Amino acid sequence: MHHTAERPRPLAGVLGVVAQVRGRGKTMPDFAIERQCQGLVCGIDEAGRGPLAGPVVAAAVILDSRRFPKMLRGELDDSKVLTREQREACYRALRRCADRGVARIGVGAASTVEIDRLNILRAALLAMARAVAVLGVRPDIALVDGAIAPPLACAVRTVVKGDALSFSIAAASVVAKVTRDRIMRGLAPRYPGYGWETNVGYATQEHGEAIRRLGITRHHRRSFAPMRLADVGDLPLFAALAAGPL
């Protein structure tokens, strides 16, 4: 049977759930959004849209809410508000959940070549689709962090700031972030001087100075504005851009 991908739209009822959550001062994610859905629910998020170097990585996570560990309920959150140590601890716990059948985890990525060819948004959506493809099961509905989602062979709903609201999306954000950071730290010894062991490819002053001094590697995103400026030799402007947040 041919399945037509449903056009992504905000999840019905999500705004009401969010209002209730905020109204009672709740700041941690939970399963409230998942409970509004029918069937097998998958959370999707990505990491690495902003860096100057490295892939964009996405994760798709399905959680069994009935067996989800109490420890993780108190610790799991949007990866951006967790420390590196907290992210790593949550990642290990999620992997243990997967080993016990409490979670299913799929990870996908798009390379720098694909980022330069497609643009970063399309590459991120491609990584999301790849993550879902390796889950091993097709979800009935995918909850995607943000306002834009890839076409999938299941119902798709976007949830703005979903990584702070939904356990499934928060789990995906942690898996994607930790996976990408590990990739960049693994590349760091092969490309000394760029500081990837700490900046993981993001635009920092150290990274910008290294690019001016050492040049661009095959892992840098040549389509990004600072890379184009470096190519044409506009180093003062490049340094200003690379030193600030992207």
Locate predicted features.
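RNase H-like, Mg2+-dependent phosphodiesterase core
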Residues: H2-L246
